[in-house]
């Protein structure tokens, strides 16, 4: 995944990484965010973008623990003012922040025509987004891309959205993961649940089917639609409400 992101960034391409939940996405995303900053001189800063405040703290602490013996600093942004300060700093940094703070900075705090506005707008950034569908909506990503026109985007997800399970969006907003992060219909790298179970990176599933005994599937289907069964279900619902 790290190498795939590096190669894509060298070509100025964005993309998404499909890694199953529990397979170590946080460590992978840290290394990927770090390597983009270290290996691609044209990138001014890398931004690890997340959604919720509790996840912000959790991820910040994880990143800082990874960076203890590393050669780069991880800067967190507790406040929007801190985010602006980090963005204005001339040093190349890896920043951990929430999309809410980024949105407030872009839409409310930066004033067009000011030195802050022009400098931050001109930065070449690489965004790495954890849980990319939850953290950044299609509209939010479009708004941020319009402001940061020199940006690359890499989304991590354990549950990509494909054509067959896409969500309806307003207008021409992206509906699938590929449309949102773009890589010609396929992830930059994938590590599926099947591979993770095989590698014993995550626990497997124990499937146990519960149902009526001694009844064929055809009989079960007929019994399911009888008035007696439907009344029984209705009684259970009413008694529990």
Give names to the regions the model predicted.
Residues 1-241:
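RecA-like P-loop NTPase motor core of helicase/translocase proteins
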């Amino acid at each position: 995944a790290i190498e795939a992101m590096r190669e894509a960034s060298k070509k100025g391409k964005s993309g998404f990484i499909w890694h199953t939940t529990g397979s170590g996405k946080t460590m992978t995303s840290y290394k990927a965010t770090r390597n983009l900053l270290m290996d691609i001189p044209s990138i001014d800063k890398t931004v690890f973008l997340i959604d919720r405040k509790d996840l912000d703290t959790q991820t910040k602490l994880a990143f800082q623990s990874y960076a203890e013996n590393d050669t780069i600093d991880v800067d967190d942004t507790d406040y929007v003012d801190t985010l602006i300060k980090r963005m204005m700093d001339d040093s190349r940094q890896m920043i951990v922040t929430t999309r809410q703070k980024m949105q407030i900075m872009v839409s409310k705090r930066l004033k067009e025509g000011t030195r802050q506005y022009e400098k931050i707008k001109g930065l070449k950034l690489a965004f790495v987004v954890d849980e990319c569908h939850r953290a950044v909506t299609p509209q939010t990503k479009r708004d941020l891309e319009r402001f940061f026109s020199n940006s690359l985007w890499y989304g991590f997800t354990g549950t990509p959205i494909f054509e067959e399970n896409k969500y309806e969006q307003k207008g021409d907003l992206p509906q699938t993961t590929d449309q949102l992060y773009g890589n010609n219909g396929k992830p930059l790298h994938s590590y599926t649940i099947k591979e993770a179970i095989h590698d014993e990176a995550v626990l497997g599933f124990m499937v146990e089917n519960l149902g009526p005994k001694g009844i064929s599937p055809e009989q079960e289907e007929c019994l399911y639609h009888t008035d007696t069964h439907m009344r029984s279900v209705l009684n259970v619902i009413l008694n529990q409400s």
